[in-house]
Amino acid sequence: MSSCNFTHATFVLIGIPGLEKAHFWVGFPLLSMYVVAMFGNCIVVFIVRTERSLHAPMYLFLCMLAAIDLALSTSTMPKILALFWFDSREISFEACLTQMFFIHALSAIESTILLAMAFDRYVAICHPLRHAAVLNNTVTAQIGIVAVVRGSLFFFPLPLLIKRLAFCHSNVLSHSYCVHQDVMKLAYADTLPNVVYGLTAILLVMGVDVMFISLSYFLIIRTVLQLPSKSERAKAFGTCVSHIGVVLAFYVPLIGLSVVHRFGNSLHPIVRVVMGDIYLLLPPVINPIIYGAKTKQIRTRVLAMFKISCDKDLQAVGGK
């Protein structure tokens, strides 16, 4: 960009630095993962909404999680695929800020829902007699609203902080989509407020959530170890396995990506970009698989849907 400007910049997305010639082929596994994520999460939302036996807090939170994963992956994947297959590298300043907001806000909302699910497990195991009173459907809906408001309020300032900056030198983003850290690095201005607020928001949302999730499981483990029989302990731990898997799938890539963004300047840019793409696609892909494999009602409904579909196909073939 030849001159400084504030709000009329057009950014250019590189994709995966060093692998530009392979973008066309890289797009196919990304599309496959996106299709799996869309299909799996839509199935979860449909089954939880239509299966009355799943209208319990844990599964309502799971439905919220699936909806967030759908929104998070859809906020980036269409543009990534357009970049990889049609060389659509340009993204307007406003579109970049909008994408940035949704990526960060939806991640914060998902973190809050994971905390709520940990609280649900804590109450169910440590205070089972109070579970129905503490976490009814009304409270569950209120927690969902709080999660949306919390994530939106904490990360709404990020686009505003970017808007105050001037961009004079490069408009090239070494990434497949827009995130605060990468856009901020292109600015020709003091970015200290952006750095401080971005780090503060992450610590106050994800940091606090991780702390309370860890505390919940510390209390859960302490309670479970006091159970008299091995079968009771195994059953109690079994109700937490799916949630632990989902928590690890979300936070491990997120923490790794945050560390690489802030302290991995010596690493090749390809590492940061690939980790970013994995972070956006891994949870939406594996969350439905984790909960589908562990939840009998979801597993049964999915198998029944496939059986009905196969029976109809066989009848159609037989009719011919």
From Swiss-Prot:
Recorded GO MF terms: G protein-coupled receptor activity; nuclear steroid receptor activity; olfactory receptor activity; signaling receptor activity
Coiled-coil residue windows: none
Keywords: Cell membrane, Disulfide bond, Endosome, G-protein coupled receptor, Glycoprotein, Membrane, Olfaction, Receptor, Sensory transduction, Transducer, Transmembrane, Transmembrane helix
Glycosylation sites: 5
PROSITE patterns found in the cross-reference section: G_PROTEIN_RECEP_F1_1 (PS00237), G_PROTEIN_RECEP_F1_2 (PS50262)
Annotated InterPro entries: GPCR_Rhodpsn, GPCR_Rhodpsn_7TM, Olfact_rcpt, OR51/52/56-like
Keyword DNA-binding: no
GO cellular component: early endosome membrane; intracellular organelle; plasma membrane
Extracellular side: 1-24, 75-98, 160-195, 258-272
GO biological process: adenylate cyclase-activating G protein-coupled receptor signaling pathway; cell migration; cellular response to fatty acid; melanocyte differentiation; melanocyte proliferation; positive regulation of blood pressure; positive regulation of renin secretion into blood stream; steroid hormone receptor signaling pathway
Induction / repression: Up-regulated in prostate cancer.
Family affiliation: Belongs to the G-protein coupled receptor 1 family.
Function of the protein: Olfactory receptor. Activated by the odorant, beta-ionone, a synthetic terpenoid. The activity of this receptor is probably mediated by G-proteins leading to the elevation of intracellular Ca(2+), cAMP and activation of the protein kinases PKA and MAPK3/MAPK1. Stimulation of OR51E2 by beta-ionone affects melanocyte proliferation, differentiation, and melanogenesis. Activation of OR51E2 by beta-ionone increases proliferation and migration of primary retinal pigment epithelial (RPE) cells. Activated also by the short-chain fatty acids (SCFA) acetate and propionate.
Full protein name: Olfactory receptor 51E2
Record organism: Homo sapiens
Organism phylogeny: Eukaryota, Metazoa, Chordata, Craniata, Vertebrata
